[in-house]
Amino acid sequence: MTGYITKGIGGFYYVKTSEGIVECKPRGIFRKQKITPVAGDVVTLETENGAAVIAAIAPRRNVFVRPPMANLDVLFLVASTTQPTPSILLLAKLSAIAVDKGVQPVIVCTKCDLAEAEFLRSAYEKSTLPFIRIDYATGEGLDDIRHWINGRLCAFCGNSGVGKSTLLNALLPDVERQTAAISQKLGRGRHTTREVTIFEAFGGRIADTPGFASLEASRAAFIPKEGLEHAFPEFGDRKSTRLNSSHVSISYAVFCLKKKKKKQQTKKENPFRISSVALDRL
């Protein structure tokens, strides 16, 4: 019997199969091999002494250590233009990690009016990154997110205060209730639980990742310079005609330094100006 892990806690894993959710434990061989099953893993179950056990883990397309999950298809990078203002560097970092791991990043703009959203959109208009503006009053953007979820495993990522919980509640009003019920059963508060939980919705799956604002592939992983131009689609087609990998890494490093040095001077200015100018000069 096969299925995928929806949640793991306290050494137990909950696997969604054609027969429903099965509680199980992994075989000891995984501990010897230093392999830890995570949410999103496709696994094979067998029965030992009347109990289900994880006998095999299918090859992973990708795996992340924070939050612990595997086989992610889409990463929604949630940002707001007000309270807090967006960090272009954080969006660049997260999108680069996602692209390098074969995950499609999608920029989602919340808590913003049309004029402010256009500044953020302009920073990515020459890239291949999809951009979705959310308006809860009209429902704008919610159908676009549902479209991306269909047939895929998705997760939401972003700084505290950008509206991830509000967005999830707008998409899935029952998620908070389901998660609260699980936390109550385990005797834990909603925000002290940091386990990934996968829900099925809109023909796909959504990973609820409480307590995680960032994304980490591996503490030992890095993107080689040969892969930088592919990890930063913001550079557009120009990367193949005017830039090689070294130029990309140097240009981006210079951009980061300028951003850091001018942080104080630009607090009252348009927060997207440096990014737009830097991209135009490449």
For each feature predicted by the language model, list its residue ranges.
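Charged helix-capping and loop-helix junction motifs
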Residues: L90-K93
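Short beta-strands and strand-coil junctions in structured, solvent-facing domains, enriched
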Residues: F12, Q83-T85, A155
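A conserved segment at the C-terminal end of the G1
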Residues: T166-E176
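Helix-rich effector regions associated with P-loop NTPase G domains
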Residues: G11, G28, K34-A51, A56-L75, ...
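N-terminal low-complexity segments that are often proline-rich with Ser/Thr-Pro
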Residues: S246-L282
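Canonical P-loop GTPase G-domain recognition
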Residues: L114-V162
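Structural detector for short beta-strands of small beta-barrel domains
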Residues: M1-I9
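A short macromolecule-binding patch
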Residues: I21-R27
